[in-house]
Amino acid sequence: DEFQRHKIGSPFETLPRGTRAILTGDFNCLPNDDAIKLLQTPCANGAPGYVDAWPLAHPHTPNAHTVDLHDATKAPRCFDFVFVSDNLGTHVRALTVNAETAASDHQPLLLEVEL
């Protein structure tokens, strides 16, 4: 139909692609929340879900705290994530959290991939 035709080739196209993708940000939820699980779930059209890069870089280690590290009134948590497309998973070499800076209530993350 007309609506679907305009979606093809646009940023909103939902067809599976062979491209690599990295998705980062402050998701304001914990690693086991439903919103995170949804990002990791394959799409109905066959496109794979995203992969959390933290366990790829740090197997068997819980996600590092990324928020409220420098606020003594709050408990540190992990709200910031780096996700990669499944075809980038084997290329993840490191993921680090800069715990030193207090420029924000969220800590910066640095992903290293080898292509």
What are these regions (language model features)?
Residues D1-L115:
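Active-site regions of metal-assisted phosphoester/phosphodiester hydrolases
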